[in-house]
Amino acid sequence: MTPDPGLLEACWRDFVLGVVQGLTEFLPISSTAHLKVVPVLAGWGDPGLSVTAVIQLGSIVAVIAYFRADLAGVLKGISGAFRRGQWREPEARLGIAMLIGTLPILIAGLCIKLYWPGYATSSLRSVPAIAVVSIVMALLLGFAELLGPRLKQLNQVDGRDGLVVGLAQVFSLIPGVSRSGSTLTASLFDGWKRADAARFSFLLGIPAITIAGLVELKDAFSGSSAGGVLPVFVGICSAAVVSWLAIDWLIKYLESHSTRIFVVYRLLFGVLLLVWWSGSASN
C-alpha cells in the first residue's frame, strides 16, 4: 500500500523541526526563534506552540541521558541530605539550586497559561519582534563575555545561583531570547566558567522543558495535528539525536572558546531577519 503523501510530508516537516530543535535548544541562539522562522521561510507556516513544545521532549530525553550521572548524584545527594542532614554537599546544593531555579519559570508559565490566552499568537512571535530580541540578546551575551574573572564552578553552586539563573530563565518565555542564552548570559555575568555555566543551564532546563512539553502533549497528539502521532514522534526522535550531539559539542567547545561565535551569529540572524521582513512587507 502506498503511504499517504500527506503523512509523508508531515513526517518530513516534523523531522526537520526536530533537527532545528536539537541544534538550537542547547546552543544560545533560541530554538523558539528558529522553530518559528524556518517553517515560515520554507512556506509551511507557524507550527504553533503545542507541536514545538512536544518536540522539545526529544531534547529532554537527550539531556537526561547525557547527564544521567549528574542527575543520579543529585538524587543521591538530596536523599543523603534528608537522611543525614548533609545539605552542604555539592550534589544536594545542586538539587536545591535546580528546584529554586525552576520555580520562577513555572510560576510565570502558569500565569501566561491562565491569564494570557492569546500568547501563542501575540506579536511577540512575529518575525520583526524575534529579530530585535535576537540582536538585544547578542549584545547582552557579548557584554557578559567582557566581564571576568571566570572562577565559579558547578560544584560551588547554591540556592542563590539557582534563583539568579532561574529568574533569567523566565525571560526565555519571550520568543527569540533563548533559554540557554538567557541562563548562560546570567551565569557569565555572575563569574561562572563557561563550560560549567553551560552544564548548569542544561540541568536547570530539564524540569522547565519537560513541563512545557507535557502540558502541550494532548494538543500536539490530537486529531487536529497534521498527520497525527507519527510525525510528532519522528520530530521527537530527530530532536533527541541532534540534541545529544549539540550538548556534547557545546560543552567541549566552551572548555577552550568564548561565546563570541554565538554573539556574531545572533547579530547576523537578527539583522538578516529584519532585512528579509522589510523586503517581504514592502511587496
Curated annotation (Swiss-Prot):
Q: Which GO terms describe its molecular function?
A: undecaprenyl-diphosphatase activity
Q: Which GO terms describe its biological process?
A: cell wall organization; peptidoglycan biosynthetic process; regulation of cell shape; response to antibiotic
Q: Does the keyword Phosphoprotein apply?
A: no
Is Cell division set as a keyword in this record?
no
What InterPro entries does the annotation carry? UppP
Identify the EC number(s).
3.6.1.27
* Pfam families assigned: BacA (PF02673)
Q: Which reaction does it catalyse?
A: di-trans,octa-cis-undecaprenyl diphosphate + H2O = di-trans,octa-cis-undecaprenyl phosphate + phosphate + H(+)
Per UniProt, the keywords (alphabetical) are: Antibiotic resistance, Cell inner membrane, Cell membrane, Cell shape, Cell wall biogenesis/degradation, Hydrolase, Membrane, Peptidoglycan synthesis, Transmembrane, Transmembrane helix
- Which GO cellular component term is one of those annotated? plasma membrane
What does it do?
Answer: Catalyzes the dephosphorylation of undecaprenyl diphosphate (UPP). Confers resistance to bacitracin.
**HAMAP family, from UniProt?**
Undec_diphosphatase (MF_01006)
The record's listing under PANTHER family reads: UNDECAPRENYL-DIPHOSPHATASE (PTHR30622:SF4)
Something else the entry says is:
Bacitracin is thought to be involved in the inhibition of peptidoglycan synthesis by sequestering undecaprenyl diphosphate, thereby reducing the pool of lipid carrier available.
Family matches, as NCBIfam families: PRK00281.2-5, undec_PP_bacA
State the name under which the record lists this protein. Undecaprenyl-diphosphatase
